[in-house]
């Protein structure tokens, strides 16, 4: 994001980002399991869909039956999911001093609805910042995967996964551009690496951020 955003003084907020099939769900679960084994309270969540409102948004934006949506409609639907998610799930957990791990957050909107849809990035960012109260993760882990390889892992595709290869290539570049503008905030990892090696890289980075977490 172009703005430094707002970071909480309590808890730890870690976000996993990247294209389809990059292993975000696997690595977020591994990180949760390790942190819990170290005595930390952890909330594992995801976007879109981890609230009652979000489930309805997820159904609309991902179902192939939805068909075409205007770009602005899609941006606003994802923003609605984020607003509800931050207000009812993410912020309360951070205020309790927990570690919050989310599978996707604002960068996904910037990469998919901004770069992927070739929409005005500043407009997309402004909407997402407002929806999330400008709350930013303390660390964003970007699992970088070549789109053809990542998409090849799916037998059935949802509405977004079913977009063209060119769309997903723009999304990948959008993620990399975000990381390139703020390299200190991101941990960019080649998703082709072995699962355990990726996990070790993530653990090594997270260890240094645990000081503000209440066990």
Q: Predicted segments — roles?
A:
Residues 21:
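Walker A (P-loop) phosphate-binding loop of P-loop NTPases
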Residues 9-13:
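Pre-Walker A (Motif I) flank of P-loop NTPase domains
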Residues 16:
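Hydrophobic anchor at the beta1->P-loop junction of P-loop NTPases
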Residues 2-7, 32, 148-215:
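NTP-dependent small-molecule kinase module
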Residues 38-132:
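ATP-dependent small-molecule kinase phosphotransfer cores
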Residues 104, 108-173:
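A glycine- and Lys/Arg-enriched "phosphate-lid" helix/loop adjacent to the NTP-binding pocket
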Residues 24:
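Conserved lysine of the Walker
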Residues 27:
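Hydrophobic positions on the alpha1 helix immediately C-terminal to the Walker A/P-loop
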């Amino acid at each position: 994001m172009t703005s430094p955003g707002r970071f909480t003084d309590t808890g730890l907020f870690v976000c996993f980002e990247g294209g389809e099939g990059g292993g975000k769900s696997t690595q977020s679960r591994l990180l949760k399991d390790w942190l819990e084994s170290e005595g930390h309270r952890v909330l594992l969540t995801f976007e879109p869909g981890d609230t009652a409102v979000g489930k309805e948004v997820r159904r609309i934006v991902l179902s192939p039956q939805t068909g075409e949506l205007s770009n602005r409609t899609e941006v606003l639907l994802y923003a609605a999911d984020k607003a509800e998610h931050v207000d009812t799930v993410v912020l309360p957990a951070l205020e309790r001093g927990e570690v919050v791990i989310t599978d996707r957050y604002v960068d996904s909107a910037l990469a998919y609805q901004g770069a992927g849809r070739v929409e005005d990035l500043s407009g997309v960012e402004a909407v997402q910042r407002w929806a999330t109260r400008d709350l930013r993760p303390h660390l964003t882990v970007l699992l970088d995967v070549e789109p053809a390889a990542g998409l090849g892992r799916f037998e059935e595709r949802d509405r977004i996964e079913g977009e063209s290869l060119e769309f997903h290539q723009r999304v990948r570049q959008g993620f990399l551009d975000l990381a390139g503008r703020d390299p200190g905030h991101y941990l960019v990892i080649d998703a082709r690496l072995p699962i355990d090696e990726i996990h070790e890289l993530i653990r090594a980075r997270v260890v240094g951020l645990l000081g503000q977490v209440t066990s």
